[in-house]
Design a protein with these regions (language model features):
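Phosphate/adenylate-binding glycine loop and adjacent helical scaffold
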Residues: 21, 39, 43
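Solvent-exposed beta-strand/loop surfaces of large extracellular or lumenal domains
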Residues: 19-29, 142-155
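Short, isolated positions in well-ordered beta-strands
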Residues: 22, 46-47, 125-129
Length: 207
């Protein structure tokens, strides 16, 4: 079947799904669909359907919200070529399951499919890390010695793509804050043990 939720509305309500005003019912395709839908409730309120383990929920955004109006910006480390690292990508046929705890799940791990092994070296030490699929990219959830000090305590995200030659570039200058850094409504994945680095990665977004 089609992923997502059903919206029921009268024409007078002015709710639009994928640009079409709803008069009766409309399917709002989830983020797990190749072509996810967008819902427009008003000039400032929009939404989309998030998916998790076969369950769906409507996430709503209001550009007039107090949090957005008072948003002060994002601090980041200066660009550092030191933190552009070339690693090795080894595909795992069929992938493997790795448990990721989430911020609000009270220690319960959710299995994510990790499609390959990423290895790299830093200061003579080899590391093997786990990144799960996120659309067409790989998502690395990591923490380091800056976490809870000069960067966000929960950790940060880095999106990756393997190169055709079997290498993978980890440019930590592109590390970003997770959604839960901006709102308690988000239930972010936490770094598994192998993604908790003992060194400080002074690159990317901080807080």
């Amino acid at each position: 079947g089609v992923s997502g939720l059903i919206v029921r509305a009268d024409l007078s309500e002015g709710i639009r799904v994928d640009g079409v005003t709803v008069d009766g019912e409309a399917t709002v395709r989830g983020k797990d669909d190749d072509s996810p839908s967008t819902v427009v409730f008003s000039d400032t309120v929009t939404g989309h359907v998030i998916a998790s383990d076969g369950s769906y929920a409507l996430r709503v955004w209001d550009s007039n919200s107090e949090g957005i109006q008072n948003f002060g910006g994002i601090d980041a480390f200066p660009y550092s070529p030191e933190w552009v690292i070339t690693g090795t990508w080894t595909e795992i046929p069929g992938g493997k399951s790795v448990g990721f705890e989430h911020l609000k799940d009270e220690g319960v791990a959710r299995d994510e499919v990790v499609p390959g092994e990423i290895t790299f070296s830093h200061e003579g030490v080899d590391y093997s890390i786990a990144a799960f699929k996120a659309g067409r990219a790989l998502q690395l959830v990591f923490s380091d010695a800056t976490s809870g000090d000069s960067s966000y305590s929960v950790g940060r995200f880095l999106f990756l793509a393997p190169n055709p030659d079997g290498t993978i570039t980890l440019d930590f200058n592109y590390a970003i804050l997770p959604p839960c850094a901006f709102s308690y409504a988000f239930n972010c994945p936490l770094p598994p043990a192998q993604n908790r680095f003992p060194f400080a990665i002074e690159a990317g977004e901080k807080n």
